[in-house]
Amino acid sequence: MSDRVIIFDTTLRDGEQALAASLTVKEKLQIALALERLGVDVMEVGFPVSSPGDFESVQTIARTVKNSRVCALSRALEKDIDAAAQALSVADQFRIHTFISTSTIHVESKLKRSFDQVLEMAVGAVKYARRFTDDVEFSCEDAGRTPIDNLCRMVEEAIKAGARTINIPDTVGYTVPSEFGGIIQTLFNRVPNIDQAVISVHCHDDLGLSVANSITAVQHGARQIECTVNGIGERAGNCSLEEIAMILSTRKGELGLETGINAKEIHRTSSLVSQLCNMPVQANKAIVGANAFTHSSGIHQDGMLKAQNTYEIMTPESIGLNRNNLNMTSRSGRHVIKHRMSELGYGDQDYDMDVLYEDFLVLADKKGQVFDYDLEALAFMEAQAEDDDHFKLQQLVVHSDSTEGSATATVKVEVNGETVTEAAIGNGPVDAAYKAVARASGCEIDITSYQLGAKGEGQNALGQVDITASYRNQNFHGVGLATDVVEASVKALVHVMNLTWRADKVADCKQKIQQEKQVLGGV
């Protein structure tokens, strides 16, 4: 048996079903090209019979993608298979994936047929699909709850009809690994022609077991895993592609299996899917979450500085990230602060470590996470009170035109003790307010990330705006809280402006230090 596991990505079919709004054809193509770079073997990109838009997107992707096999879904109906075949016909290589329910509850309650009738439909669908391609996949929907005798019979007959891949889905995420592994093992033991097809699994995450069930399945002989980027999909989602890829890579010695995934594309692909699907990745998500390579505990940070593999079983570089993160919090030890100052280019002679660490702990207790620009300001600026701001918002007035979508904002901003009033027109109230503040302050800041949340519940909830801004090749993080979203947005911007002002002051201090070093070096 081959030790190569086929990765069948269904982000653009099962994954898209979870979205509040459908992706455009252009967005689907972007994701498909990213999946091709990632190295997926097969990508299921839609259900052509379902709508003209889905048909168009499948056809566009089939025409464009060259290095992955493009697949489309169809029910066990000739009209579905016709639509799939027509949409895929422009591809160099393609697969038709047809399915029918096999569990008793589905057969009797949903299809209202006998199992023998369903079996006949399945065989007919596979034979019909084979008229268009040799690559036909057949799925036994709700296989996890299908009586094993019926499942074995269905698999044997589908293979006889010409299916070259047999998919065993845990459609409702009901089975546990030992149970699901037993199903796969039983198929290999009892289906006489099982060696004529690749056994695939498609596990859902309703009980949080989709990845575990998929890994158990390949340990029992399955050689295709159906999955999605970031695990998106129906209800609680699907088996996560990135988790499967890195499990098989990291534990290759134990499992003896491999994939064709280019792991260095994982982070980029995950970010693209998250952005286009408007589905943020939870911070503690395995492999691609913001905290996956972030260490906050002082003990862990100390271990990481001594040997990276003390607390990391894979490197961030392996999935396309540049580095891990040691979050500077009140739990960080002196060693971490000294290490970070060294990375920023400072020697022991440039600052007082005792004073810096004492001030750091005070600031960390106050704001939680301390960033590089905070640390440099603590080291080189005497006045570090955060309420002693260079910029202060005094007044904000916004008028919106609901018919045209434009808005006018007037702001009063205190700049170094003097009040400056400015107005601006923008594409919406936040844009107008940001332009007015920029005029008043003279600061041109590039906003790279904007997130809106809430603190509290009901009518008393505060809008929280978190922004990331780029200024002189450095990222700054600002937060604003207010009952009004526009006001919260402006407060976040003013927060960033004060951080960049301090950063400029720190840069002046750094320049003086360098000049003093040069003078001393020349003496």
From Swiss-Prot:
It catalyses: 3-methyl-2-oxobutanoate + acetyl-CoA + H2O = (2S)-2-isopropylmalate + CoA + H(+). GO terms for molecular function: 2-isopropylmalate synthase activity; acetyl-CoA C-acetyltransferase activity; manganese ion binding. Its EC number is 2.3.3.13. Keywords: Amino-acid biosynthesis, Branched-chain amino acid biosynthesis, Cytoplasm, Leucine biosynthesis, Manganese, Metal-binding, Transferase. Its cofactor is Mn(2+). GO terms for cellular component: cytosol. InterPro entries: 2-IPM_HCS-like, 2-isopropylmalate_synth_dimer, AIPM/Hcit_synth_CS, Aldolase_TIM, LeuA/HCS_post-cat, LeuA_allosteric_dom_sf, LeuA_bact_synth, PYR_CT. Residues 5-267 form the Pyruvate carboxyltransferase domain. It comes from the Bacteria. Residues 392-523 are annotated as: Regulatory domain. One of its GO terms (biological process) is L-leucine biosynthetic process. Coiled coil: none annotated. Its main location: cytoplasm. Mn(2+) binds at D14, H202, H204, N238. Pfam families: HCS_D2 (PF22617), HMGL-like (PF00682), LeuA_dimer (PF08502). It is found in: Cytoplasm. Pathway: Amino-acid biosynthesis; L-leucine biosynthesis; L-leucine from 3-methyl-2-oxobutanoate: step 1/4. Homodimer. Catalyzes the condensation of the acetyl group of acetyl-CoA with 3-methyl-2-oxobutanoate (2-ketoisovalerate) to form 3-carboxy-3-hydroxy-4-methylpentanoate (2-isopropylmalate). Belongs to the alpha-IPM synthase/homocitrate synthase family. LeuA type 1 subfamily. NCBIfam families: leuA_bact, PRK00915.1-1, PRK00915.1-3. This is 2-isopropylmalate synthase. It comes from Shewanella piezotolerans (strain WP3 / JCM 13877).
